[in-house]
Amino acid sequence: MNPKFSVLFLVEAADFLDGLDEKSRRKVIYNIDKSRYVNDPKLFKKLTNEIWEFRTKYQKNQYRLFAFWDKRDKRETLVVSTHGMIKKTGKVPKPEIEKAKKIMEDYFDDDGE
Protein backbone atom coordinates (compact mmCIF):
# COMPACT_ATOMS: atom_id res chain seq x y z
CA MET A 1 0.00 0.00 0.00
CA ASN A 2 1.34 3.42 -0.96
CA PRO A 3 1.42 6.29 1.52
CA LYS A 4 -1.16 9.05 1.06
CA PHE A 5 1.43 11.77 1.66
CA SER A 6 5.06 12.47 2.53
CA VAL A 7 6.11 14.43 5.62
CA LEU A 8 8.60 17.29 5.77
CA PHE A 9 9.82 18.37 9.21
CA LEU A 10 10.77 22.03 9.40
CA VAL A 11 13.55 23.06 11.81
CA GLU A 12 11.37 23.60 14.90
CA ALA A 13 9.58 20.28 14.40
CA ALA A 14 12.88 18.44 13.98
CA ASP A 15 14.30 20.18 17.07
CA PHE A 16 11.22 19.17 19.07
CA LEU A 17 11.67 15.53 18.05
CA ASP A 18 15.40 15.67 18.79
CA GLY A 19 14.60 16.92 22.30
CA LEU A 20 12.45 13.90 23.17
CA ASP A 21 13.79 10.79 24.84
CA GLU A 22 14.47 7.90 22.48
CA LYS A 23 11.34 5.84 23.25
CA SER A 24 8.99 8.82 23.00
CA ARG A 25 10.60 9.96 19.75
CA ARG A 26 10.23 6.46 18.25
CA LYS A 27 6.55 6.31 19.22
CA VAL A 28 5.82 9.77 17.75
CA ILE A 29 7.60 8.92 14.49
CA TYR A 30 5.87 5.53 14.35
CA ASN A 31 2.46 7.22 14.66
CA ILE A 32 3.32 9.84 12.05
CA ASP A 33 4.40 7.10 9.65
CA LYS A 34 1.23 5.11 10.39
CA SER A 35 -0.94 8.18 9.69
CA ARG A 36 0.48 8.29 6.17
CA TYR A 37 -1.35 5.02 5.41
CA VAL A 38 -4.55 5.09 7.51
CA ASN A 39 -7.21 7.73 8.02
CA ASP A 40 -7.38 7.92 11.82
CA PRO A 41 -8.15 11.19 13.65
CA LYS A 42 -6.49 9.74 16.74
CA LEU A 43 -3.23 10.07 14.81
CA PHE A 44 -3.77 13.01 12.43
CA LYS A 45 -6.54 15.52 13.09
CA LYS A 46 -7.75 18.73 11.48
CA LEU A 47 -7.69 21.71 13.86
CA THR A 48 -8.64 24.56 11.51
CA ASN A 49 -9.18 24.94 7.78
CA GLU A 50 -5.42 24.94 7.26
CA ILE A 51 -3.75 23.50 10.36
CA TRP A 52 -3.64 19.84 11.35
CA GLU A 53 -1.92 17.98 14.17
CA PHE A 54 -0.08 14.69 14.42
CA ARG A 55 -1.15 13.17 17.73
CA THR A 56 0.63 10.70 19.99
CA LYS A 57 -0.25 9.65 23.51
CA TYR A 58 2.60 7.83 25.20
CA GLN A 59 3.43 7.27 28.88
CA LYS A 60 0.78 9.77 30.05
CA ASN A 61 2.11 12.51 27.75
CA GLN A 62 0.27 13.92 24.77
CA TYR A 63 2.65 14.90 21.99
CA ARG A 64 1.49 17.20 19.21
CA LEU A 65 3.21 18.18 15.99
CA PHE A 66 1.42 20.86 14.00
CA ALA A 67 1.28 20.65 10.23
CA PHE A 68 -0.26 21.90 7.00
CA TRP A 69 -0.71 20.52 3.47
CA ASP A 70 1.41 21.51 0.48
CA LYS A 71 -0.30 20.15 -2.64
CA ARG A 72 1.52 22.24 -5.24
CA ASP A 73 3.45 19.25 -6.62
CA LYS A 74 1.01 17.13 -8.63
CA ARG A 75 3.17 14.02 -8.19
CA GLU A 76 3.51 14.13 -4.42
CA THR A 77 1.31 15.42 -1.62
CA LEU A 78 3.38 16.86 1.19
CA VAL A 79 2.44 17.47 4.81
CA VAL A 80 4.76 20.03 6.38
CA SER A 81 5.26 19.81 10.15
CA THR A 82 5.91 23.22 11.71
CA HIS A 83 6.65 22.59 15.39
CA GLY A 84 5.70 20.43 18.33
CA MET A 85 4.63 20.56 21.94
CA ILE A 86 3.70 18.35 24.85
CA LYS A 87 0.05 19.12 25.48
CA LYS A 88 -0.90 19.70 29.10
CA THR A 89 -4.39 21.20 28.74
CA GLY A 90 -7.68 19.94 27.33
CA LYS A 91 -7.63 22.07 24.20
CA VAL A 92 -4.73 22.95 21.95
CA PRO A 93 -3.62 26.47 22.96
CA LYS A 94 -4.59 29.09 20.36
CA PRO A 95 -1.06 30.59 20.29
CA GLU A 96 0.27 27.22 19.05
CA ILE A 97 -2.24 27.20 16.18
CA GLU A 98 -1.39 30.83 15.36
CA LYS A 99 2.31 29.96 15.39
CA ALA A 100 1.69 27.12 12.92
CA LYS A 101 -0.28 29.49 10.65
CA LYS A 102 2.54 32.05 10.72
CA ILE A 103 5.13 29.40 9.87
CA MET A 104 2.89 28.17 7.03
CA GLU A 105 2.56 31.70 5.62
CA ASP A 106 6.33 32.18 5.78
CA TYR A 107 6.86 28.79 4.12
CA PHE A 108 4.70 29.70 1.12
CA ASP A 109 6.05 33.28 0.96
CA ASP A 110 9.65 32.03 0.93
CA ASP A 111 8.78 29.77 -1.99
CA GLY A 112 7.69 32.71 -4.11
CA GLU A 113 4.00 31.86 -3.96
Can you describe what each PLM-predicted range is?
Residues M1-Q62, K71-V79, M85-E113:
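Basic, Lys/Arg-enriched alpha-helical interface segments
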